[in-house]
Amino acid sequence: GLVGSEMCIRDRVEQLRKMNAAVLGTPEADPFYGAPTVLVVLAARDNTNRVYDGSCVMSNLMNAAKAVGLASCWVHRAKEVFDSEEGKALLRQWGVEGDYEGIGHCILGYRADTAPAPAPRKEHYIYRVR
């Protein structure tokens, strides 16, 4: 039922959290900041533009999240997580076949606090070249 499915999803997020924290070198940390949802972006390793393409996917996911009122954050170390034997086994378990590289984890949830005010714009940060 639904409860079992939710537990399964929570277990997967927890597994990804532990794997990411291990790469970070702080096994007890929560690099996902308590977010209930983690989207993993992968790209075919033989795609020479995989990091650029995957980065565009991450950016679009984060923009879409903002558009529907969700908070998001790009969490690194997906490459290291999915290059590990445990990560490769996880991909096989999910039915992902082929040689993929992890690009990023996009965490989603609702903010626990209000968003900080934007930083002031930097003067002379963008230059127009004619």
Regions found by a protein language model. Name each.
Residues 22-23, 89-93:
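Short, hinge-like loop/turn segments at secondary-structure boundaries
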Residues 16-53, 59:
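Helix-adjacent hinge/juxtasegments
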Residues 96-130:
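C-terminal helix-cap and adjacent tail motif
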Residues 10-14, 45-47, 112:
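Short, charged/polar surface micro-motifs in flexible loops or helix N-caps
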Residues 45-90:
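Small-aliphatic-rich amphipathic alpha-helix that forms the alpha element of a beta-alpha
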Residues 28-30, 92-96:
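A generic local secondary-structure boundary/capping motif
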Residues 1-3, 7-8:
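Short, small-residue-biased leader/transition segments that mark boundaries at the very start
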